[in-house]
Regions:
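NAD(P)+-binding Rossmann beta1-loop-alpha1 motif at the extreme N-terminus of oxidoreductases
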Residues: 2-60
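Internal alpha-helical scaffold of NAD(P)-dependent oxidoreductase catalytic cores
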Residues: 2-6, 100, 125-133, 139-204
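Short, glycine/charged-enriched secondary-structure capping and boundary segments
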Residues: 29-32, 52-55, 84-88, 122-126, ...
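Short, charged/polar "capping" segments at the starts of alpha-helices
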Residues: 44-49, 116-118, 161-165
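A short, aliphatic-rich alpha-helical micro-motif
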Residues: 62-67
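N-terminal Rossmann-like NAD(P) cofactor-binding module of classical short-chain dehydrogenase/reductase
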Residues: 70-71
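Conserved NAD(P)H cofactor-binding loop of Rossmann-fold oxidoreductase domains
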Residues: 74-75
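Rossmann-like NAD(P)(H) cofactor-binding subdomain of soluble oxidoreductases
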Residues: 78-143
Length: 204
């Protein structure tokens, strides 16, 4: 378990897990923001497409690099019923991260839509060796120009240290200041920034 101290995290290497429509869009955006961006998918063809179309570096082993951030974009509904949640892929990914991640204190951000209680299950699998946030996407394939990756969104963190890590990542640009707004509104419980983020501590 992490010893919670004042966070001063540096994010460089980001791994996007799940390279479908959402994951590929997220990977492209993360790369555009200046991060060293990698991708993983159980479908090797998806990794090849991400590499060819966007230069996303494919990986099979989460321990092959010392990743600072794991962004989970795997599907969370049954293949034949989009209204029935299925979190096996999320938990399998979390288990793989738990077994293979080299860096204690890295950030795990779940961007997939998940049912209540899922973040807590992921957090327990990781035993707070890594920070966990839920930053549900608002990306819409049919209107990507208006509803792309960079939108105001809500972030929930299991602990305050998780929220701080999530906020730092989602407002980091690796020096590309033109890619985000500078203004950040802070209150005792709510933080607003871009890619953009409205952050509330909660335990799901």
């Amino acid at each position: 378990m992490l010893q919670v101290t004042d966070l001063a995290m540096t994010f460089s290497k980001v791994l996007i897990t799940g390279l479908g429509q959402l994951g590929l869009a997220a990977a492209k955006y993360v790369k555009e923001r200046g991060f060293d961006t990698y991708g993983y998918d159980i479908n090797t063809e998806a990794m090849e497409i991400a590499h060819r179309s966007a230069g996303i570096k494919p990986v099979a082993d989460f321990g092959s690099h010392e990743f600072d951030v794991y962004v989970i974009c795997v599907s969370t509904h049954k293949p034949d019923d989009i209204f029935s949640p299925q979190i096996d892929g999320i938990l399998s990914t979390a288990d793989k991260i738990s077994r293979e991640a080299k860096k204690d204190g890295a950030l795990v951000s779940i961007e997939s839509t998940i049912p209540k209680g899922t973040s807590k299950k992921v957090f327990q699998l990781l035993n707070h060796r890594l920070h966990v946030v839920h930053a549900p996407h608002r990306w819409y394939a049919l209107e990507e120009k208006e509803h792309g990756v960079n939108q105001l969104r809500v972030i929930g963190g299991v602990y305050n240290c998780c929220i701080r890590a999530g906020m730092q990542f989602y407002t980091d640009t690796k020096g590309n200041e033109d890619k985000r707004e500078r203004d950040i509104l802070v209150s005792s419980t709510i933080l607003i920034a871009t890619w953009g983020s409205l952050c509330i501590q909660y335990r799901t």
